[in-house]
């Protein structure tokens, strides 16, 4: 079983990842009702979570475990929300319980966006704006490049979810650190496992 764990900058993250690695995503249930994006999400097998119901975590972890054991690639954003792309927020460990339960291999994925000059682009950032405002910001740009950096896999066997949250958060934070030059040519996933 394989799980992708990524930082979360924009609603574009899902569509960027899915073009490289067809995956099932975990998303807040509200997205189901969004125009167009809700329809897209439903049609790619998204697993929806009722975030206001604490007890829904048990159900969603079972759904993720089932998906993983049947061979589906599942992707999660453990920050639970989007950031401005300059920092990685604290990873919540709850959704990583499914990886522990099935001893999944976890691939940390660092996501960032660049503008035409190669600098970090703020246009895709989905923080304190409506979906329409976000789309408008993106459409005003002449060009945006998404960079998906797949780090070395993390074996979940023998680890707990908190340990996995800390480890994957640190890996992604280090990968996105300013010292690392943008446009580094990452290895292309042929959609993963080469263990």
Stretches with model-predicted labels:
Residues 30, 54-57, 88, 128:
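A conditional alpha-helix N-cap/helix-loop micro-motif detector
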């Amino acid at each position: 079983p394989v799980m992708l764990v990524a930082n979360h900058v924009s609603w574009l993250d899902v569509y960027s990842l899915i073009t490289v690695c067809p995956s099932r995503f975990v998303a807040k249930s509200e997205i189901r009702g969004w125009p167009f994006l809700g329809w897209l999400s439903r049609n790619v097998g998204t697993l929806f979570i009722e975030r206001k119901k604490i007890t829904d975590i048990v159900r969603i972890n079972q759904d993720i475990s089932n998906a993983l054991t049947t061979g589906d690639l599942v992707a999660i954003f453990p920050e639970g929300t989007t950031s401005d792309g300059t920092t990685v927020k604290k990873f919540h460990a709850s959704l990583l319980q499914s990886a522990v339960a099935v001893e999944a291999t976890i691939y940390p994925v660092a996501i960032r966006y660049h503008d035409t000059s190669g600098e970090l682009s703020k246009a895709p950032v989905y923080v304190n704006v409506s979906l329409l405002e976000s789309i408008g910001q993106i459409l005003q740009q002449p060009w945006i490049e998404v960079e998906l950096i797949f780090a070395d896999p993390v074996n979940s066997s023998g680890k707990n979810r908190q340990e996995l949250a800390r480890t994957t958060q640190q890996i992604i934070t280090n990968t996105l650190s300013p010292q690392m030059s943008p446009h580094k040519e990452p290895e292309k996933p042929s959609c993963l496992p080469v263990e």
